[in-house]
């Protein structure tokens, strides 16, 4: 079942009521209004309003159900997320396998990750009517551990093609459509972290990204092949270029990405579900039950 995504952009209160998530706010007549949501139906929650109160009991329940909770800052951009300590009954077995992974295994997994990312970047360019052959050739040449830094070479060419004649450079604080890319990537990161935790893996122990100040190294690794899905949505719509700050309409569009269909293995499924499939296949790789991480691809047009 596809989990629901909820967006809370108005003042109010979130609390737990009879094992349901309850949202209480006031209407134009200052009368109290309340809505409830079954926790088992939820997969993703965005808390945007700075005047939103959330109870501790509510946060505990959301963490227990492994529901991704993203908190936004004063600029309405994602700034933090709720990370449960445990989300899988086999967590110890999976975590031990992850921590025992050899450098050779991690290098092989990173090669697969970079290859999948570049392949999806090439498909993104093709869908936008841009030249993609160079990236397809580059994807086939990625070495273990990406020792030749094919990821960076691909990124440079990729964003040059996406930008075209416009003076665009990819940076966190840059001009549009950077805000849309930042928002979309942050949503992806939270979704991937949720899936990894749900599979009993440690987000802090990456296969490539390793930084003592980054508790989401593995999420940053595994989300890489998913980035082109955000890119394709952003660069195919001029709405994300028009304004320096994202409005509710643009944010709603980006959140719809989680329900967009992709090809995962041999099946067509929503992106959010495919992230869980990728996470599960990564676990099997750590357990030495499989040798290839299953990343999603674009649905062919």
For each predicted feature, which ranges?
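Active-site helix-to-loop segments that bind/position phosphate- or nucleotide-bearing substrates
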Residues: 2-5, 11-12, 24, 64, ...
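A broad, structure-centric signal for solvent-exposed, well-ordered loop/edge residues
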Residues: 23, 30, 44-46, 54, ...
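Glycine/small-residue-rich interface belts in oligomeric ring/scaffold proteins
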Residues: 34-90
């Amino acid at each position: 079942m596809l989990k629901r995504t909820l967006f809370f952009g108005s003042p109010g209160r979130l609390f737990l009521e009879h094992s349901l998530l309850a949202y209480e706010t006031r209407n134009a007549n200052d009368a109290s209004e309340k809505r409830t949501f079954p926790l088992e139906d939820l997969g993703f929650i965005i808390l945007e309003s700075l005047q939103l109160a959330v109870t501790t009991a509510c946060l505990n329940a959301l963490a227990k159900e492994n529901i991704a909770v993203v908190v936004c800052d004063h600029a309405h951009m994602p700034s933090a997320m709720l990370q449960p300590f445990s989300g899988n009954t086999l967590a110890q077995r999976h975590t031990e396998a992850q921590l025992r992974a050899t450098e050779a295994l991690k290098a092989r997994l990173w090669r697969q990750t970079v290859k999948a990312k570049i392949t999806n970047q090439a498909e993104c360019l093709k869908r936008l009517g841009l030249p993609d052959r160079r990236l397809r050739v580059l994807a086939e040449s990625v070495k273990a551990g990406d020792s030749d830094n094919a990821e960076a070479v691909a990124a440079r060419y990729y964003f040059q093609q996406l930008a075209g004649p416009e003076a665009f450079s990819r940076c966190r604080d840059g001009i549009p459509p950077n805000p849309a890319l930042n928002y979309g990537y942050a949503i992806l990161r939270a979704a991937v972290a949720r899936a990894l935790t749900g599979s009993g893996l440690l987000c802090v122990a990456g296969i490539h990204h390793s930084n003592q100040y980054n508790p989401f190294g593995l999420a940053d690794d595994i989300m890489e092949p998913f980035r082109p899905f955000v890119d394709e949505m952003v660069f195919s719509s001029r709405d994300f270029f028009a304004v320096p700050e994202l409005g509710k309409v643009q944010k709603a569009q980006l959140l719809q990405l989680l329900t967009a269909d992709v090809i995962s293995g041999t099946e067509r499924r929503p992106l959010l579900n495919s992230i869980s499939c990728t996470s599960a296949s990564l676990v099997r790789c750590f357990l030495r039950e499989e040798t290839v991480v299953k990343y999603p691809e674009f649905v062919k047009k």
